[in-house]
Amino acid sequence: MAGSTSSLVICAIGIYATFLTWALVQEPLATRTWPNSMGKFQFPNVISLIQASVAMMMGYLYLNWKKVEYPPRKMIKDHWKQLMLISFTQSSSGPLATTSLKHVDYLTYMLAKSCKMIPVLLVHLLLYRTPIASQKKVVALLVSLGVTIFTIGGNDGKKLKRSFNESGNDNKLQGFGLLFSSLFLDGLTNATQDKLLKANKAKEKGKQTLITGAHLMFTLNLFVILWNILYFIVIDCKQWDNAVSVLTMDPQVWGYLMLYSFCGAMGQCFIFYTLEQFGSLVLIMITVTRKMVSMILSIIVFGKSVRFQQWVGMFIVFGGITWEALNKKKANIPKAKSA
């Protein structure tokens, strides 16, 4: 790791710059009513398709830059089942989360997306039967408590407390259901991805079959494209037509869409590079801070009103996740000394 400080700084700045911009572009892209079409660009699968296309091209450049010895075509042939599952859960999670914005506010969406630890733990517990430490359970409870406080403490939370029979509450519950489904798929994605990487490292005896972050970035985005095309053909062809109509009537949406996709693709490069060079602990520290700054920027730039209870909820969530990261660091210190 000697002499890697500058690389770490570049990675952190890259993740901050790309994903803070990504988050700021995402909100107007998903919630703004465009003047000519008089509609919102709420076409999650179209957004997913465009973003995956840009990310796949970026992943291809990333592969060439790394000069990997394991051809992506052979990697797909060897691991197509895992890639299909991961890409399916990944491609389904994003549209569900985006659709939830029709029913919940953006800050609730952002905070919920910061709680990926809980579904990951649940998937490991229920699907892979992985023992979960008590500390992880406490952190999961803290995160859940923080989300509850944040939601109830907001203006929308007042409506929930008045009556569960109001018409708006059905939409609110539907939004939470979409967010819950998205988080579960995120957990399934991450857990299956971890299983694939660990199994590959255990069997790998040379660089000829080593799976890198660049491999996953390219192949997973390729499969995401295929899944979305299949969705348009079989389930919802009108979504594509409606999206094209909005883009034709309001061409300025293209600017937001391409900037959103480009920032997401660049962010994936920095994330995978950080994961390979510095490990998951450093990546967790950077991404947790990034999510917190994203919400604060959303408050400042878009004038969101946040009550005291919501701030308490935020600090509980990020405090719990940070505590988890610090505990991982302490657990890794003895391993580093014995190495």
From Swiss-Prot:
UniProt entry tagged with the keyword rRNA-binding: no
Entry-listed glycosylation sites: N165
A single MF term (Gene Ontology): UDP-galactose transmembrane transporter activity
One cellular component (GO) term of this entry: Golgi membrane
GO biological process, one term: UDP-glucose transmembrane transport
Membrane-spanning parts: 5-25, 43-63, 107-127, 137-157, 175-192, 215-235, 246-266, 281-303, 308-327
Pfam families for the chain: UAA (PF08449)
Chief location: endoplasmic reticulum
Keywords: Endoplasmic reticulum, Glycoprotein, Membrane, Sugar transport, Transmembrane, Transmembrane helix, Transport
InterPro entries in the record: SCL35B1-4/HUT1
Keyword Protein biosynthesis: no
Subcellular location: Endoplasmic reticulum membrane
Recorded topology in the membrane: Multi-pass membrane protein
Cytoplasmic side: 26-42, 128-136, 193-214, 267-280, 328-339
Intervals, Lumenal compartment: 1-4, 64-106, 158-174, 236-245, 304-307
Family: Belongs to the nucleotide-sugar transporter family. SLC35B subfamily.
Role played: May be involved in specific transport of UDP-Gal from the cytosol to the Golgi lumen. Involved in the maintenance of optimal conditions for the folding of secretory pathway proteins in the endoplasmic reticulum. Overexpression confers resistance to the immunosuppressive drug, leflunomide.
Protein name: UDP-galactose transporter homolog 1
Organism: Saccharomyces cerevisiae (strain ATCC 204508 / S288c)
